[in-house]
Amino acid sequence: MFDGLSTYKSFFLVAFGAVPGAICRMKISDNLFRNKHNLWGILLVNSSACLLLGFFLAKQNYIHYINNDQPLYLLLCVGFLGSFSTFSSLILEIYYLFVDQQWMELFLFTFTSIGLGIIFISLGSHLFNA
């Protein structure tokens, strides 16, 4: 992944993108959905991250700087979207549902999250494929 750049520059780009991604995730989740277990916030953030990732995937063929070893890819796709999307929060909420034996919510949330992720990455790729 880091073949085109020095390792330190690659790490810096990922970190530089990760900080605003994490802040955006926190602001969206906290401001829109204030309860402790915010399944809707996680769905919103992850779906929008998948939509943006679909956009970048669609543009990879046309914009050299979005290829896997390029600065823009590391900054936006790995850094920003990697910290903006909330896989660990997703798993934590699934765990809470499991521990609380809320089986219907667990399966609904899990499959909705995965399904929306696939739909939104496909939608982003389709909408922005030029």
UniProtKB/Swiss-Prot annotation:
The lineage of its organism: Bacteria, Bacillati, Cyanobacteriota, Cyanophyceae, Synechococcales. InterPro entries: FluC. Fluoride-specific ion channel. Important for reducing fluoride concentration in the cell, thus reducing its toxicity. Na(+) binds at G82, S85. One of its GO terms (cellular component) is plasma membrane. Keywords: Cell inner membrane, Cell membrane, Ion channel, Ion transport, Membrane, Metal-binding, Sodium, Transmembrane, Transmembrane helix, Transport. It is a multi-pass membrane protein. Belongs to the fluoride channel Fluc/FEX (TC 1.A.43) family. The chain crosses the membrane at residues 4-24, 38-58, 72-92, 103-123. GO terms for molecular function: fluoride channel activity; metal ion binding. Na(+) is not transported, but it plays an essential structural role and its presence is essential for fluoride channel function. It catalyses: fluoride(in) = fluoride(out). It comes from the Bacteria. This is Fluoride-specific ion channel FluC 2. One of its GO terms (biological process) is cellular detoxification of fluoride. It is found in: Cell inner membrane.
